[in-house]
Structures are given as structure tokens and as C-alpha cells.
């Protein structure tokens, strides 16, 4: 989004807004779910967010925006490469012990680029490939969390565990 009016315009055309009580989650998910639906990507989600999320709204928005963008782009590529495939995104946020789990999973066309050290980078060309996932990794590490990325049988998963230091109640 280039301005707040772009985000507002997107939210204004959305069928149903997500209302968890966390503005970062609500804004990102409302926009991304609407976009995915309009582009033929099936979505399922479950949100059980804590009252005080252990990341600030900018960090949380960056993480959610990046992982959702990657999943949506994978769905769009899948439609182009094999129109018989049905792209999907499965997403959840939930507490587990003293952690907050953020998980996104999608099917994809099987094309991934990696770095020498085994990090998954991107399928994009040019200087900006892989920047989003690197940013996610930085933010998760800053929060003393764990980022796990897996790819198996054309299923791509990002699993993030963030310590819930306040062990606070759910919204």
C-alpha cells in the first residue's frame, strides 16, 4: 500500500472484516483474505490472539504481510502453471504453552530458490528476491522466537513461535 487511503479503499471493498481486537491482525488479514478470495485462492484461518501480542503492531504487520504475500504469490503462480490445481492457504494464530504460534501453509508449483546455507530465498527475480523472508527471520529472532520453514510434496509451510512473556489472556 502506498498510502493509508489505499488500505482504507481495500478494506471498504472487503466482504467481511476480521475483528480480533488486534488492529495489525485485523487489517492485514482482512485485506489478504479478500485479495486471495478475489484471485481464486481458497483460505481457511483460525485466530486465537493474546490480548497483548508480544510484537508491536509494525513488527507483527511486517511478519503477517510478508508471509501472506508469499503464500498469495505462490497461489497465483500455481494457477498460471497448472490451471487444474486449486490453490489454498491455511493460516492460524494460537497459543501453545508459553508461546504464540503463527502458521501459514499453502500449496505451490514446486519451484523454490535457496541460498548456499540452506535458507529458502524466493522464486522472484532481481535484487529484492528473498527480502521479505529475511525480514521475517530478523523480527522473529529479535523476539527470541523460532522460524521454521518447510517444503514437502509441493506444500510450503512457515511456522513461527514467539514467546508470550506476559502469558496473557486471549482476546
Stretch-by-stretch model annotation:
Residues 5, 9, 21-39:
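Short beta-to-alpha transition helix within the HATPase_c
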Residues 17, 43-64:
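Conserved short strand/loop->alpha-helix "switch" segment adjacent to the catalytic nucleotide/phosphoryl-transfer site
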Residues 65-74:
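Conserved polar catalytic motif of the HATPase_c/GHKL fold
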Residues 73-95:
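ATP-lid-like helix-loop hinge signature
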Residues 98-130, 169-171:
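Glycine-rich/acidic phosphate-handling loop/turn and adjacent ATP-lid/helix
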Residues 110, 152-159:
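Glycine-rich nucleotide-binding loop
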Amino acid at each position: 500500500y502506498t498510502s493509508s487511503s489505499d488500505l482504507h479503499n481495500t478494506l471498504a471493498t472487503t466482504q467481511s472484516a476480521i475483528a480480533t481486537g488486534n488492529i495489525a491482525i485485523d487489517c492485514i488479514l482482512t485485506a489478504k483474505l479478500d485479495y486471495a478470495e478475489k484471485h481464486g485462492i481458497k483460505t481457511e484461518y483460525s485466530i486465537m490472539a493474546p490480548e497483548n501480542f508480544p510484537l508491536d503492531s509494525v513488527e507483527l504487520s511486517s511478519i503477517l504481510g510478508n508471509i501472506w504475500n508469499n503464500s498469495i504469490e505462490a497461489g497465483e503462480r500455481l494457477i498460471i502453471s497448472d490451471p487444474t490445481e486449486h490453490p489454498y492457504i491455511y493460516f492460524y494464530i494460537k497459543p501453545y504453552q508459553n508461546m504464540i504460534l503463527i502458521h501459514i501453509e499453502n500449496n505451490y508449483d514446486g519451484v523454490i530458490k535457496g541460498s548456499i546455507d540452506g535458507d529458502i530465498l524466493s522464486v522472484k527475480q532481481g535484487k529484492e528476491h528473498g527480502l521479505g523472508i529475511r525480514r521475517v527471520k530478523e523480527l522473529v529472532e529479535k523476539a527470541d522466537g523460532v522460524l521454521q520453514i518447510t517444503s514437502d510434496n509441493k506444500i510450503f509451510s512457515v511456522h513461527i513461535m514467539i514467546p508470550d512473556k506476559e502469558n496473557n489472556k486471549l482476546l
